[in-house]
Every structure is written in C-alpha cells, then in structure tokens.
Amino acid sequence: MLKGIHKYLLMCFGTVLFTVQANAARIMSNNPIKEDWQCKVVDGEWSCKRAKKPKSVFDKKLTKTEKEKALADDLAWVKKPSYFVGGYYSNDNQFTKALCESKKTDLSYEKSEFDNYGTLIASGNVQVLQCDQELYGNNAIINLNSNNSAIRSLVMAGDVIVKQPSTGIVIRTTELDADMNNGTYSTGEAYFRLAREMPKTRIYDKEHFSGYLRGYAKTFKKESSGDIVLSDGYITSGDPYDNAWKITGNNIDIDTNTHMAYVKNGYFEIQDIPVMYIPYFSHPIDDRRRSGFLYPGFVQNANSGIGISVPYYFNLAPNYDLMLQSVIWSQRGIIENGTFRYMTKYFQGQFEGSLVPYDFKEGKMRGSFTLSTTGQYENINTNFKYEYVSDQNYYNDFSAGNVNLVTKTLLDREFDLTYTNDYVDSGLTVLDYGVVNPLLTVDNTPYAKLPEVKLNLTSDGYTPDYLTLSAQTLNTFFYKTAGPANTNPGAPQGTNVNAFRAYESPKIAFNFNKTWGYLNPSLEVPIRYYQLKNSPTDTIQFANSSVTSVLPIFNIDAGAYFDKDYTNENGTYTSTLHPRLFYTYIPYQDQTNIPLFDTSLQNEQYMQMFQVNRFTGYDRINNANQLTYAIEASTTNQDNGTTLASAKIGQMAYFADRKVNLCQGNSACPNPGLMDPFSTDTFSPIMSSFEFQVMKNIYLSAQVNYRVNQQNVDYQVYQLSYKDENENIFNVSYNNIANNWNSLTQQQIAEGAKPQPQETITLSTVLNITDHWGIAALWNYNFQQKQIANIFAGLQYNAKSWAVRALWQKTAYTNQDPNNPTLLGPLVNTYMFEFELKGLGGIGNTSDISSRLQQINGYQVGEWGNGI
C-alpha cells in the first residue's frame, strides 16, 4: 500500500512535532531494553532508533531459541537470573508521563511525504507518543485533523509495537490500523501481554510470577466499547521463554466492562500438545467477582467414593452472590450444594445448604444446611446461627475428611442481641443444640438457654481513676430435653433438672497504679438464686426446689516493676523484673445442692493462679484462703517491640483445704477426694511459663508444673518452632498432662470419674527444598491410646507458570463414641489433588488442602499458593 502511493507524494525530510520541545524524560538510559534503541540529540531534538535491528518474531525462519529471544525483546521482558521466573516485564511510562500533563502528541520519524490531501506518509523509526500510549513502527500513513494539530487516524506497518503503561498492555504486530479519536484499533498477526492482578502470596510475588498473561492472535481488535477480540490465538501466564501450557481458541473475547475472558472452541495444551478439548471457557482477568463456571474439583471419601464437582458462580449484585455446585459421587449419586451470601448496610450473612435427592446406598433423601447472619447498628449487635443435618452419618459421608464436620456431635442454634457502650454491657441470648448422634446421653448434652439476659454496669468515667464500682447480672432459664440415661445399649430415656438461675454480683475495686507498681484490692459479693424444676426421671435428684447462695470474694493484687535499659551491637533492650502477689479469701459453702449447668474445672496452669475461682461458669465458687507469689522477667527489643525472652514462675500457698468440688445432688461421688487428690495440700505445684528466642528464627516455649510433695512434673507442654525468611517451618510439640480435667464429660463428672492423663507428640514441617519442590507433613501420636491420631504428607511442584500439589492424610477421628470424645477410631485415608495454572486459578479443592496446612503451627494462608 505504501509503495503504490509514493508517486503522488511530495518528498520532505525531518520531524513533525505537536508537543513542546523534547525533554530529558525521553532519555533512554532508564529504558530496560536500551540495547535495542539508541537516542541522541539532532538539531536540538531527540532522535531515537534501534542500535541494531532485531530479528522479527514473525520470521518463519527463526529457530525456537531465536523466536523466544525476539518475543522477549518485543514484550519488554527484562532478564534477571536471580528471579525464579528469570526476569520481569518492564512497564515504564517515562516517555508519556509529561504528555499527560500537556495533553499533546509527540510524532517523530526519519523521512516523510505529504499527498495532495494532507496525508502524511512517514518512514524510518516512526514514533507516536501520547498520554499513556506509545506506538512504534517502521512506516506509517497518518491522517491529521483539519489544522494539523493532532492525529485523526493512522496505519502503521513493519515491526509495530503498541504500549499502554497504565494497564501494562504491550502488543507486537505486523500492522496496525488505529482510530485515534475513539481509541479503536485492529492488527494483523500479533503477540501481546496483559497485566493480571495477583494475590500477594509466596508463589505469586514478583520473583515467582510475572503478574501477566501473554498470548498470540491472528488478528487483535479493540472495539469502541473497549472490548478486545482475538481470533485463532492462545493465552498463557508463562514468560516469553516458558511455553509449558496454553489455552487456545478460535475466538477469544476479553470484555473490559465485566473484566472477563471468554474462550470458544479451543484446547488446553501442554508443551504445545493438546491434552483436553475446551468448547467454552471463561475466567476473570482481575480479582473481581464474576458469574461463570469455576474449576472442577476432585474429592475422595472412603464412604462415598470419588466425587467430581462442577461449580457455577452467580455474581447477582455487588452485595449478594450465589454459588451452586453439583457433585457426582461414584457410590452415592448427585449432591447439590449451594451458598448464598449477602451484605447490607446493617447486616451480612450466608446460607449454606446441600441436598442429596436420592442416596443410592441409603435409598433416601439426605441433606444439611447452615444459616448464619450478623448485624450492627451503632452500639447494637446481633448474631444468628442455625444448623441442620438429616442424619448422624451425613457429615462423615460427604465432608471429604474435614475433621471439624466428621467429629461434630452438636448443631448450633443461637440468637444474640447485645447493646454496649462505655458503661453498659447488656444482651439477650437464646441458645439451643441439635444432637447429631442420638446415642449422646442426656448428661452429655449441653443445656439450652431459653433465654439468657445479661446486664453489666461499670462506673468508669464517673468515679475517680482509683475507684471502680461495677455490677454483673445474668439471668438464665436452663432447659434440656430427654435423652438416653446412660451409655448402655437400649438405655431408657432420662432427663436433667431444668431450672432458672439468677446471678447478681456487685463489686468495688480500688486501683492504685504507679509506673513502678500497683496495689489493687477488691471486694465482690456473688448472689445466686436457683429455682429447680425436679422430675422423677432426672438422672440426678436434688432435695430442694430452690437454692440461694451468697459468698463474698476478697482479693488483693499487688506487684512492682524493675526496669533496666541497655544497648549492644544488636539494638536497645529493656529488661523487666515483675514480682507479684495475689491473695484471695472466699469462705466455704456446701454447693452440692446446686446442679452443674455451665461449670467445669480447669487444668492448673500459670495464669490460673491469678484467678479468684478455679471453676468455669457460675455454679461453683471455690473456698479460698490462699496466696500466690510469683516473679516474671522479660527482655524486650525497644526498636521493634519483640520479646526475646520471657520467664514466669510462681506457686500458691493454701491456708485452708479446698472443699468445693463438682459433686451434685445424689450423683455418684462416693469419695470426692478421688476427684481432687491434692485438695488438702499446703502448696500448689510450682507453675512456670517460658518463651525464648533461642537464636534467629528458632523459638522455644514451655509450660511446666512441678509438684513438690510428689516430686514429679504433672503438667508439661513444650513447643520448639523454626520459621525462616523462605517460609520453611519446623515444629516439635509435646504435652504430658497427668490429670486432664478438660477431657471429662458431664456424665463422667456426675459419676465421680477421675480425670485421665494425656500424652501426645506432634511433628510438623513445611519445607521449600528448592524454588520448585516443597513438602508439608504432620505426624501426631497419642501415647495413651498407643496409636497415630493424625498424619498427612503433601508435595508441591512449583513451576514458572503452573503448580501441582498432592496431599495424603490418614486420620483417626474421635466420632466413634459421642460420650467419649477422646476415643480414637480406626485410621481413615483421604486424598487431595490440585493443579494450578498461575494467573487462571486451579483444578481441585483448595480449601481441603488449605485446611490441612493450617494445622501446622506458623503456616499462613497463601504461602503455598492462591487460597492455599
């Protein structure tokens, strides 16, 4: 076309400028591909041309290596061997930044000719620079507007490169036809790159992923709507030297309004070999939510076989959406899952439901759902949750080994309404539970609260700083339906006493706080009133129908601070010594005539020494005449606030035996001393808590209780952790608890059972062996039951533009006996797999792998990939 016009042209030489004089911003010294361009001043103006003409990526005679090099140059790929992906894409706006302010166009070339109609024919290093747009080519036909002050349209040919710095778009093509007024253009054969916003995770940082999609098309067209239409092309996230995978298509449409890419009639290729036909494919080109099919998932479950899931996402509105997922199980049939989420100005929540229309194995319909919502208006907050499941085995059959669901014995059904400000904390709670396993005894089923009303008041802000007056009010109606009376097969139905409890606790506290220490005495008087509704079928009988309890609690908390600052070559530090005394007096009161509604006994730990009551809940208040004496020491880095070392050690001296226990009514407590064999000791164990940064990246923590009278350690928990800058993790944890009160069920407490010991060890690691290979593993062993409780091993291979992960897990679930939640069952296998195309998501269920990795102490979501 250019050759045919030459005979009508008037020859001229030089450069036409529509802008101010060229400025220093056009100097190429900062251009990452400066080896291909050379700029110098000619007649007071900048002139840029390639120092050495590169090879054309469209040259059919190029070798594979030469073509990759040419493409890398054209797409502004800058080599950086230290990066895992080998480099990065340059995206420099230095040539057009000034033009955005002046709103002018910079046109330059080596030779030009005008025809009779004012059309400019330019040749030789033609450059058109506008705000946020760069055009480079060998030749151009340029149509100017009526006063020659701007370009109306142009046709450019020969080594054409189009750049848009703001979006990162770069196009390398053979020819370009552009309308500068409406921003439309079309090209011939073209290579391109598009920016893709990625999550900030380890394998998606700038060293491990380019952050771009690139591709090829026979034609590349940008329409007036801004949409991009490609024909006979492909897309991939690999750099110009990486062709590991591609998604090809006869038609590829990129909708810039919905930010979606649509591929029709294509293939998924690995190393240019088609491996899967794709009739239709859609995916967002940014991180915003879009309607469409998501990647299929593969699930394995020992009870249901293999499941293949096909999810579809509906982006219904900015504030609500819907996910539908069909799963075809090889042994069960089809299950339909749905998740609806919504958000308004004052409320947000979601509905999750699943339905098995017909289970092939069970021959019936099955399902479950969870409805949850929260709300907030100024100082008012609400919370609602309701769970339902059709049968006790549903979670075990369809949860793919999710331990939180497989071991679930109770369904939450709760509504909360609270109002809080600086002086008032009030609320209404309605709480009930659904029982998953009907073998759960009535004693082990928690009480419903129908309802519970609280009102807490404080004088903060009204009284002097040294004085605080407060009152706590909690009124609850406890209710429980009938259930199995015991764990024997065919046990009769039994009940537990229902009751109303009123709890009032006024308190006066003095706060004498100084920079060097504190003295804080307080007096609290809990008043409890119970109205019991006894029944002959109650498993535990109580003689009285009403009970009143009044107990004063006197407490003094005192301590001092001794600080010392010092500086060394590593920074400035503060060492603090904190001796502390904590005295409590509570008179004894027989409370066996009060049922246990929400009360249990805690394990002895260091921080428990500074609590006035060793029982949780409100149904037991221990008698006390005891003094805690302790000393705490710590060293803190003043530069970053980190604690290098912390040591705490203390003991309690008892001036009276502990007489209050968990016996209630006529329950089996033949020898209450068996429950607490140390109730007559004069001293508690020596309790300690330690945390040390052993060296860089290595941390050690320990909690140890040493009982002097028996000369043994009856509580010990150790944790050794390592995590470095490369996110390598290694943990060893060991715990040995001689009397684990936390493991006792309510029925075991009623029977006067002695707390059982607990001893376990856990090893876990995430090890990035190389930039490519990584492993994750966890091993947990239960010494008391002499078996593995949980073990998994995962393997990841991370390539430049894709990653693959596989994980195997073997778990002994604690769902064998709902009345013995510590009993381990047989080991069950679960397998998980994910294949991820960087920039386009993955195939597989990332939540399954992620939930396992999060069991490793120190692991953070994203360190193994997007959502992992």
Curated annotation (Swiss-Prot):
Subcellular location: Cell outer membrane
Range of residues in the leader sequence: 1-24
Assembly and interaction partners: Component of the lipopolysaccharide transport and assembly complex. Interacts with LptE and LptA.
Family note: Belongs to the LptD family.
Function: Together with LptE, is involved in the assembly of lipopolysaccharide (LPS) at the surface of the outer membrane.
A GO cellular-component term linked to this record: cell outer membrane
Species per Swiss-Prot/TrEMBL record: Francisella tularensis subsp. tularensis (strain SCHU S4 / Schu 4)
Domain of life: Bacteria
The keyword Signal appears for this protein: yes
Keyword Membrane among record annotations: yes
Keywords carried by this UniProt record: Cell outer membrane, Membrane, Signal
Encoding gene per record: lptD
GO biological process, one term: Gram-negative-bacterium-type cell outer membrane assembly
HAMAP family, A to Z: LPS_assembly_LptD (MF_01411)
Pfam families: LptD (PF04453), LptD_N (PF03968)
InterPro entries found in the cross-reference section: LipoPS_assembly_LptD, LptD, LptD_C, OstA-like_N
Protein name: LPS-assembly protein LptD
